[in-house]
């Protein structure tokens, strides 16, 4: 059950009767085998079947598609970067990693970084995280996993395209490129549109939950990001929410899993007709 839940990034567990309600994997926070195996299954499920098919067929880094290389690179950066961030930020926090030995702190920081990518298990109490860690958690939950996977979120490739577009803009390049390949401007525009829609819904929904429930904005944002990214983590306030807010979170879960996916498919497969009118260009002052 837990292996399937991990691979499918579901986050459901049967450990409540053993370690207490809503304990998740907290009872195993000193067990490298349990956390390591679970984290590995989460990563495998979150990479996407397209990437794994490419890996099985090519079996060599140099022969992998540019897309697979992008996904693997961004995934590695997010996991390692997230683990280092949580290790440093929560190092002395007694509510999370503070009372653990060094090796256990590193293990749980790594697991925290992995599980935020739409898995939903937790080995440390999310309610005890610092405000900075909660903010970073929101970012990782909104990013999610990779396209064609069991994970939700914006997807790693979308974030990769946005970062590459930022690099091209800062360097004054006319094309967005990655490893000798140019990314079509339409894909860049799609990524920007999708990111802006998700950001708007996230900010607005967080404001609504915060206002209705009279909760700190960051705690509300954590719940909303968890719902939109189909993660399932909570700081502990979900059972106390009113039916209105719980209903909103349910809608956000559907949007996070079905809505964003459908939105992406509409961009990719939508019928496009050549413009019958070509308008003259105009200059707009930016910044």
Regions found by a protein language model. Give the residues of each.
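Membrane-proximal intracellular helices of multi-pass ion channels
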Residues: 1-287
């Amino acid at each position: 059950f837990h292996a399937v839940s991990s691979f499918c990034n579901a986050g459901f567990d049967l450990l409540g009767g053993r370690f207490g309600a809503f304990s998740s994997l907290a009872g195993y926070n000193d067990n490298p085998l349990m956390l390591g195996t679970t984290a590995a299954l989460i990563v495998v499920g979150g990479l996407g079947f397209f990437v794994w098919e490419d890996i099985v067929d090519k079996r060599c880094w140099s022969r992998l598609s540019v897309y697979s290389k992008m996904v693997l690179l961004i995934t590695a950066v997010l996991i390692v970067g997230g683990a280092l961030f949580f290790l440093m930020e929560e190092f002395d926090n007694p509510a999370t990693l503070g009372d653990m030995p060094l090796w256990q702190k590193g293990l749980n920081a790594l697991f925290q970084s992995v599980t935020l990518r739409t898995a939903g298990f937790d080995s440390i109490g999310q309610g005890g995280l610092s405000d900075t860690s909660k903010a970073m958690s929101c970012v990782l939950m909104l990013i999610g996993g990779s396209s064609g996977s069991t994970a939700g979120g914006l997807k790693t490739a979308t974030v990769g395209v946005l970062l590459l577009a930022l690099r091209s803009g800062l360097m004054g390049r006319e094309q967005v490129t990655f490893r000798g390949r140019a990314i079509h401007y339409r894909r860049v525009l799609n990524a920007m549109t999708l990111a802006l829609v998700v950001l708007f819904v996230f900010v607005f929904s967080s404001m609504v939950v915060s206002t209705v429930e009279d909760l700190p904005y960051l705690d509300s944002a954590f719940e909303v990001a968890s719902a939109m990214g189909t993660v399932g983590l909570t700081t502990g306030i979900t059972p106390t929410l009113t039916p209105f807010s719980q209903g909103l979170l349910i809608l956000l879960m559907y949007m996070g899993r079905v809505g964003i996916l459908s939105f992406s498919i509409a961009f990719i497969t939508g019928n496009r007709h050549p413009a019958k009118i070509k308008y003259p260009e105009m200059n707009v002052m930016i910044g």
